[in-house]
């Protein structure tokens, strides 16, 4: 039956589910959006219920995010099988501070930069009820934005209670936003009638400068895709795998692909900004004319970038002398036709929201992934992901980030679950980050390869170990990975580590091996170290790369020979090389140099002495730089700002061998309070370090110190929570 609850201060209305189902879903919107899209909203609600989810429809005149959260908590208490929610229209946005360790890469100084830039817009405020937040203030310009701080005594890891998504119209698109939202909801409702569309048409594109343009990364992705999307392989044109090198400009070919009505999933692996996607970089110049054009554009732009600071003619003459060109070279400096052609050339290298609006482009892939920075910036008045769901095409779901994101993240983790009828939101919840969001209908799903009940069982059998053990030998890689994840989540006694190492060693599935290593990182035992040692030489580039990254995070000396071998023997893997190089910089200099000497004593390589010297020289530069930074960090006479900058560097470079020095900085009451607090925060990044137990023990002792400043006490508490397994 339908019931309405009215009469509270923000005119809340709750329409309860019309049907009983094993699990439930909530649609949350504001009263104005509801009033203007009522018919479409109810069509969507009915379609979701027909697809197996008991559905609540909740609207209100929300004054702040806490009011929305209260109704979510109330609904969850009433219905513990609530699995997900969608926020439609003008639902307040929480911008979170003091939680950068929950992002993949965002590390902006919250004290030095404006709040709207240094906070993270995130719906984890709504979907992760384990987290504790403290309200700070409403934004003075955008009244839909509210700042919160993650409290120090909150859990410090993401563990969402539900999945979530936003359906938020990009205001810059103009037009009637309510008509656009209604149109989208009708599209999403109508799509549910197709119960037979399997995930068998997939497109993957790698943009310029992504993952160092490494061709091994691009090639090895296909090893995973064959496991993720078995139906897309072995049939005509089921899978396309492009990268930017294939065409310049590539964007117009991509526009054609985006209009294919048979396409199920489109993955953009690229760099981005809120309103743009980087597709190509500068064209490689292979003939004289193109080289001349490139030189002309570069020097003309160099002159114009300084106009205003100095006179244009003076700048031109200086450039002629500096670059040894004559006056005729600059004859087009004031020619509008040159600048028009130049700007078109630059524009061809990017897809921007203006392109999509001007062309009124209909995008048709059912789901689109943007693993770039900022493409999911729904808090802005325009954002890439929003443009792809609000058009006349068939796109129902987009995945994007509100802040910058780590390139080396395993972006396609678990994506193959979509091949097995798992809902888009359920998949996204498994790979959660503070900045990562879904846009559109999170209940969307493809028809499974084989009939199953996975999408319900993820909620209903969450803690049923016997159920998940039974799926460990599924014929499908992603189902095995899901089973391992569910077992690890339920492993309160920390007993699963031997099984995960066994899985790593025995599985022929690349993605299962990668999931095993990721889960072993929770255990930080000998099995994890052993998996890393073998993983550095794994046939799947992503396993080798993540093993190199973890090897740096861990700092276990026994890994040094394997890191050096990966660095030298596999230099075609550019991201593995970069990660191994960084990892070596986090180990003591003498041990690294000895390992390199030992390695070269045993191998036969062309010009091995010269190669060894080059490697030692490049590492020496890193060690010298590190020693300088550490000296500044420890120097009580150095300016406070410089010391803090050196300490903040430790968040990215966890020098395990300096931990005792770092602890002394915190202990020393003679240090400025801010230096001690920032140092305590930096130690929270040693989550995988061999020094973690030692750090924990020492800072727990510090907590007992008399007259500890409140800020420092709070930071120590947060660091203890971050480092506790």
Identify the role of each PLM range:
Residues 1, 8-19, 47, 65-248, ...:
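Structured catalytic cores of large enzymes
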Residues 8-50, 55-60:
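Acidic, contiguous N-terminal accessory segments
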Residues 26-28, 55-59, 84-88, 201-206, ...:
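Structural recognition of the beta-strand scaffold that forms the well-ordered cores
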Residues 118-184, 293-410:
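Catalytic cores of nucleophile-dependent amide-cleaving enzymes
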Residues 411-494, 510-518:
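Caspase-like cysteine protease fold
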Residues 461-470, 491-504, 525-536, 556-568, ...:
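Amphipathic alpha-helical scaffolding segments comprising HEAT/armadillo-like alpha-solenoid repeats
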Residues 475-476, 508-509, 539-541, 571-573, ...:
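Short inter-helical turns and helix N-cap capping residues of alpha-solenoid HEAT/ARM repeat scaffolds
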Residues 478-491, 511-523, 544-556, 575-590, ...:
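Structural detector for internal amphipathic alpha-helices that build alpha-solenoid repeat scaffolds
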């Amino acid at each position: 039956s339908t019931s309405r609850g009215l009469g509270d201060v923000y005119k809340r209305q709750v329409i309860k589910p019309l049907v009983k189902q094993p699990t439930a879903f909530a649609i949350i919107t504001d009263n104005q959006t509801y009033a203007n899209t009522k018919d479409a909203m109810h069509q969507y609600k009915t379609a979701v219920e027909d697809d197996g989810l008991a559905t609540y429809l909740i609207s209100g005149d929300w004054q702040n995010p806490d009011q929305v959260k209260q109704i979510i908590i109330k609904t969850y208490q009433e219905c513990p099988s609530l699995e997900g929610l969608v926020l439609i229209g003008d639902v307040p946005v929480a911008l979170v501070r003091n939680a950068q360790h929950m992002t993949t890469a965002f590390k902006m100084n919250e004290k030095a930069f404006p709040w709207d830039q240094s906070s993270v817009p995130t719906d984890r405020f709504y979907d992760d009820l384990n987290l504790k937040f403290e309200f700070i203030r409403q934004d003075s310009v955008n009244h839909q934005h509210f700042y919160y701080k993650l409290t120090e005594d909150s859990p410090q890891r993401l563990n969402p209670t539900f999945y979530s998504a936003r359906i938020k119209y990009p205001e810059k698109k103009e037009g009637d936003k309510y008509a656009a939202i209604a149109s989208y909801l009708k599209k999403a409702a109508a799509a549910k009638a197709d119960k037979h569309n399997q995930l068998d048409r997939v497109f993957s594109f790698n943009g310029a400068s992504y993952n160092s343009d490494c061709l091994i990364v691009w090639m090895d992705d296909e090893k995973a895709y064959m496991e993720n999307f078995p139906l897309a392989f072995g049939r005509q044109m089921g899978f396309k795998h492009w990268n930017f090198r294939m065409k310049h400009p590539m964007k117009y070919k991509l526009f054609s692909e985006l209009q294919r009505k048979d396409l199920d999933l489109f993955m953009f692996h690229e760099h981005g900004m809120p309103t743009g996607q980087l597709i190509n970089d500068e064209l490689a110049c292979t003939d004289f004319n193109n080289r001349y054009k490139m030189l002309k554009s570069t020097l003309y732009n160099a002159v114009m970038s300084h106009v205003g600071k100095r006179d244009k003619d003076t700048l031109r003459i200086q450039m002629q002398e500096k670059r040894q060109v004559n006056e005729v070279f600059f004859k087009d400096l004031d020619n509008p036709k040159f600048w028009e052609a130049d700007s078109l050339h630059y524009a061809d290298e990017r897809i921007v929201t203006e392109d999509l609006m001007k062309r009124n482009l209909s995008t048709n892939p059912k789901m689109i992934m943007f693993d770039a920075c900022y493409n999911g910036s729904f808090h802005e008045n325009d954002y890439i992901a929003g443009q792809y769901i609000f058009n006349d095409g068939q796109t129902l779901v987009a995945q994007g980030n509100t802040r910058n994101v780590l390139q080396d993240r395993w972006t396609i983790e678990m994506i193959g679950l979509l091949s097995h009828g798992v809902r888009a939101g359920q998949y996204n919840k498994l790979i959660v980050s503070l900045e990562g969001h879904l846009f559109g209908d999170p209940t969307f799903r493809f028809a499974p390869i084989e009939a199953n009940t996975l999408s319900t069982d993820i909620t209903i059998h969450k803690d049923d170990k016997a159920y998940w053990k039974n799926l460990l030998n599924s014929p499908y890689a992603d189902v095995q990975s899901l089973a391992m994840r569910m077992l690890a989540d339920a492993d309160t006694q920390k007993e699963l580590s031997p099984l995960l190492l066994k899985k790593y060693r025995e599985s022929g599935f690349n993605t299962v091996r990668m999931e095993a290593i990721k889960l072993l990182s929770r255990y930080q035992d000998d099995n994890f170290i052993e998996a890393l040692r073998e993983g550095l030489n794994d046939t799947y580039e992503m396993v080798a790369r993540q093993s190199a990254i973890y090897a740096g995070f861990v700092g276990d000396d026994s890994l040094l020979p394997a890191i050096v071998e990966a660095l030298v023997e596999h230099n075609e893997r550019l991201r593995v090389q970069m990660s191994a190089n960084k990892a070596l910089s986090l180990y003591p200099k003498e041990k690294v140099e000895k390992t390199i000497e030992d390695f070269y004593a045993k191998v036969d390589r062309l010009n091995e002495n010269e190669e060894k010297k080059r490697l030692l020289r490049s590492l020496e530069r890193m060690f010298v730089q590190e020693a300088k930074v550490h000296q500044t960090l420890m120097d009580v006479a150095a300016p406070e700002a410089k010391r803090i900058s050196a300490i903040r560097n430790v968040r990215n470079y966890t020098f395990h061998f300096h931990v005792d020095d770092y602890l002394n900085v915190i202990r020393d009451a003679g240090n400025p309070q801010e230096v001690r607090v920032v140092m305590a925060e930096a130690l929270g990044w040693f989550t995988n370090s061999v020094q973690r137990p030692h750090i924990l023990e020492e800072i727990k002792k510090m907590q007992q110190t008399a007259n500890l400043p409140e800020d420092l006490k709070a930071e120590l508490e947060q660091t203890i929570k971050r480092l506790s397994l």
